[in-house]
Amino acid sequence: MLRLPPIIVCFLSCVVFQSQAQTKVVGECAITYDIHQIASNGDKSLVGQKQIFIKGNSCKTILKTPAFTQTLIFNTQQDTAIILKEIGLNKFLQYILYASMQPVNLVASKKNGTISTILDYPCETITLSSADGNAMEVTYTTVIIPTVTVYEQAFKEIPGLVMRYQLTTKEGNKILYSANKVDLSPITLNVFEVNKSNYQQIN
């Protein structure tokens, strides 16, 4: 019987281990994106920020702009979601059917073959095209993937954590979301709680 030297056996074991390595599923994380509008000449202007909080099946997104703040809270195992909107001193609360958040109707996807590094995470890029004529260039890492990916419906099939995405409308308008922070610390449950007495409920 052929006997392999210990060093070769160790090397082969490492190769097998690496080939079987899978993307790590992260049950709790927070991601912050800076939002830039891109002019036709390529100039960028900061127009807002988007924060994502994920814990298990629960997700909270906060979109902040100079004009308003909008929050979406949902659980992928529940039928309803909550939208909070703050415009000046006015605060509104609305319940919506989570099922009504329909996935984007994608008609094509193409990997760009571009390899980059964002916040020390190795990333690759894919371009998604939808039936309405819009396109989204998504840069993501396969090192980790959150338990909830549908904080943007187009991300449902992305096999990792999205670090940057650029939306280009059929009219040519461009909005860029770039992660400036990824925090894998535990998320407390009160992040998803809402003091409903502070809001006016609307239909």
Predicted feature residues:
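Extended soluble regions of mature proteins
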Residues: T23-N203
